[in-house]
């Protein structure tokens, strides 16, 4: 009984290994085209701004109709969590991303400038690319 279980486990492991070996490999190549996106092309927005009239009606003219899309841009504040020793994550290979109050837009994560150091060395960057480039 135990021999059959071990044999079935070995067969299952070999099938999984063969399928993983046959899967296409992810290759990093020098692709300078970058991400492509289209956001909000031809979009329009309408708001149901209400108005109250009459005697003793609450007229909040400061907020009424003007607070439909509030945007309070607050940047990253480098505050030390541990105390006197500031610990910070330095993003060396990627770009610093900071997008605030941008409607119908995309902030795409791309490779930073330091990630492209070996891009033009063909033996390192485009190995296995198949002659494209």
Swiss-Prot record:
Residues 1-28 form the signal peptide. The keyword Repressor does not apply. GO terms for cellular component: extracellular region; spore wall. This is Rodlin protein RdlB. Residues 45-70 are annotated as: Required for amyloid formation. It comes from Streptomyces coelicolor (strain ATCC BAA-471 / A3(2) / M145). GO terms for biological process: cell adhesion. It is found in: Secreted, Cell wall; Spore wall. Residues 45-57, 59-70 are annotated as: Amyloid-forming. InterPro entries: RdlA/B-like. NCBIfam families: rodlin_AB. Belongs to the rodlin family. Disruption phenotype: A single rdlB mutant does not form the rodlet layer on spores; disruption can be complemented by rdlB from S.tendae or S.griseus but not by any rdlA. Decreased levels of rdlA mRNA. A double rdlA-rdlB deletion shows no effect on spore germination, growth rates, differentiation of aerial hyphae into spores or surface hydrophobicity on a number of media, but spore surface rodlets are missing and cells adhere less strongly to a polysytrene surface. In the double rdlA-rdlB mutant chaplin proteins are still correctly localized to the cell wall of aerial hyphae. Forms part of the rodlet layer on the spore surface; despite their high similarity both RdlA and RdlB are required for rodlet formation. Plays a role in cell adhesion to polystyrene plates. Forms amyloid-like fibrils in vitro composed of stacked beta-sheets. Keywords: Amyloid, Cell adhesion, Cell wall, Secreted, Signal.
């Amino acid at each position: 009984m135990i021999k059959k279980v071990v044999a079935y486990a070995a067969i299952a492991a070999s099938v999984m290994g063969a399928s993983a070996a046959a899967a296409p490999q992810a290759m990093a190549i020098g692709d300078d085209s970058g991400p492509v996106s289209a956001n909000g092309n031809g979009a329009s927005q309408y708001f149901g701004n209400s108005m109250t009239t009459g005697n003793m009606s609450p007229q909040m003219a400061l907020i009424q109709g003007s607070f439909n899309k509030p945007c309070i841009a607050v940047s990253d504040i480098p505050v030390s969590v541990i105390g006197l020793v500031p610990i910070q994550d330095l993003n060396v290979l990627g770009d610093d991303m900071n997008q605030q109050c941008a409607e119908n837009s995309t902030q795409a994560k791309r490779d930073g400038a330091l990630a492209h150091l070996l891009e033009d060395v063909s033996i390192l960057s485009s190995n296995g690319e198949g002659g494209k480039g």
